Amino acid sequence: LENTNHNYTIVQGELGTKLFLQTLMNQTSVCFDTETTGIDALNAELVGMSFSWSKGEAYYVPFSENRDEAQALVEKFKPFFESETIEKIGQNIKYDLKILSNYGVSIKGKLFDTMIAHYLINPDMRHNMDVLSETYLKYTPKSIEELIGKKGKNQKSMRDVALEDIKEYAAEDADVTYQLKQHFGPILDKAETKKLFDEIEIPLVPVLAAMELEGINLDVPFLKEMSVEMAKESAALEQKIYETAGEKFNLASPKQLGDILFDKLKIGGTKQKKTKTGQYATGEEILSYLANDHPIVKDILDWRQMVKLQSTYIDALPNQVDKKTGRVHTDYMQTVAATGRLSSNNPNLQNIPIRTERGRLIRKAFIARDENYTLVSADYSQIELRIIAALSGEENMIKAFQNNEDIHKSTAAKVFNVPLEEVTKEQRSHAKTVNFGIIYGVSAFGLSNQTSLSRKESAELIDAYYQTYPKLKSYMSAQVDFARENGYVQTVLGRRRYLKDINSANMMVKSGAERNAVNAPIQGSAADIIKIAMINIHKKLTSENWKSKMLLQVHDELVFDVHHSELESIKPMIKHEMETAIAMDVPLEVELGEGKNWLEAH
């Protein structure tokens, strides 16, 4: 900053603010940024706001520590924020939306988020402002650490920083973000992702902000009970493992565990994988592969799962309840998963394990607002399979979906060449594994690991599968060819996934990119579809003044807090909006459930 021409001004006093507002209201496109007392938007207070609408020029408006005075100043800026004609630019603008919402301001008009723009341009890169500025503007902004120090107990608050220093830092943020917008706008147009940006990603920002501010109710006493139970169970299992091993050892130490399993108990023969440091590898993948070789392996996997559940969810969730609201507020991130799917943090809802009984129980802790509300879960049924059927134009699969057949049973009947009514449970289960595995490039080796089939039987099953659905095979090859030629693949709505390794000389790396060439358009299309549904449902809930709220989005599922008086009218609305989010040759199907808690509803 010191070596760059810039003109940053502090806006103060009644007259200064009035004159500034007159100029501000005459602009058509303005970048703004809030400076606050912390990163938790629910509890942070405004320290200041910066604005920029021209390169090298920016303004900083400081806010009083007195809440009433700060609120009075915010009110003066309401006409700007609520103007439909002025475009507002920001970097991670969802945070600013949440801060302003706490001051009773709802932002209207067109939005532009540089972080999201860059995510669509280059999903695999980092998207924070400093990186973007250095990469695209060849300019290094002041770091927050220069102002308040490193994270930790000695870190200062923004309130403690001298006005002149905070002005330079905050105004620079707005200036840099404004310049990034000028840079990214044309690139978005060229990459043909502007429609996705304008119609899905940007309209989704206020939807996610509303969901995050709403939060969800948590049954803390239930989790405390579960914690005591889980501690007992894992301690008992630990003792059992020591008895089987014939000695006590540190279960959490991969080295000690490797020595016990492979030197002492000689599990899995002599060819055991070692890490760079020379100790045995004991990761989940390796142990899962050996699970049938010795009972101790299954117990160790079980014990690990219990310990992880307890530390990551059962004991952590109660600490994530906000003191002010008494609810848990997850943070949704739009710019992390390269496929276009949302991810979440604090808590990470996407990773709550649902394949095991214990993992599913954690959902029981998420409960309705009070006795007047019920949780409703709406889940897309087999959305990825429906998408690949539509994209590949595979008639056999499309017909099965159109006739509302059980797709796994229907696949089994065709693959094993038996009448539909004679398909066994086991045949259906094998067909299901292939159906879901095929888009992730499942191999005969992988299939035999997941089922009771031998490798030879698995290879035969995969061959029969491709003969049953020949267009799937040709679609998958065409996707890989397209990626080889263009360096990217795209979703139904034009979301791109760049695959720089698609022509790599390294076979492992190349086959990973080939798998992505097939599954990125499918996962990404599923992500686009649920995002459209969320935008449309949110629009209805707010414009029609429903009491019910949308709370969570996890994978292909949406969770709502529904007022009893609205239960029967909201369910068909949700189902309709989700099933008609996008028109395809294959019908989308949504399953609805309801209950006092998320487990019951799902």
Annotate each language-model stretch with its function.
Residues 70-72, 253, 565-572:
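Short, conserved charged micro-motifs
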Residues 250-252, 549-554:
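Short beta-strand
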Residues 101-111, 125-130, 394-398:
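A short alpha->loop->secondary-structure connector
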Residues 2, 29, 36-70, 377, ...:
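Metal-dependent catalytic core segments for phosphate chemistry
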Residues 106-122, 404-408:
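Conserved beta-strand -> loop -> alpha-helix junction used to position metal-binding or nucleic-acid-contacting
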Residues 1-65, 72, 82, 91-93, ...:
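Conserved "right-hand" nucleotidyltransferase catalytic core of DNA-directed polymerases
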Residues 468-470, 576-584:
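A common structural junction motif
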Residues 156-159, 206, 213, 322-330, ...:
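Conserved catalytic core of nucleic-acid polymerases
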